[in-house]
Amino acid sequence: MFELDILGKDGRIKLLNNAETYELYQYSNKNNSAGNDYKSLILTCREDNDYQSERMIKAIKNIIHCMTNNHQPISSAETSLETIKIIHGIINSVKIGNDPNNI
């Protein structure tokens, strides 16, 4: 089973069900049970991919579509670089003694 939960300054990204499902959250100043000084996370988007499709096939089809229609692919070099930066940040955090289970 693969799950990933990333909290950032603007919100949260959750990958669930072996990355077949993702959820996007944004912070809100709405009052919650924790008190007035705490922000709430509001679910803004949820996508459930069907298990019949293969993610790599979808990615390849997207690249082909973009090449034939002069569009930017979903996974560009910029998004790949951002992914590497996140991974690098996690590695550095562990190196300075942070528990990887609490990152």
UniProtKB/Swiss-Prot annotation:
Lineage of the species this protein comes from: Bacteria, Pseudomonadati, Pseudomonadota, Gammaproteobacteria, Pasteurellales
Protein name: Uncharacterized protein HI_0688
Domain of life where this protein originates: Bacteria
Source organism (scientific name): Haemophilus influenzae (strain ATCC 51907 / DSM 11121 / KW20 / Rd)
Gene3D superfamilies the record matches: Dihydrodipicolinate Reductase, domain 2 (3.30.360.10)
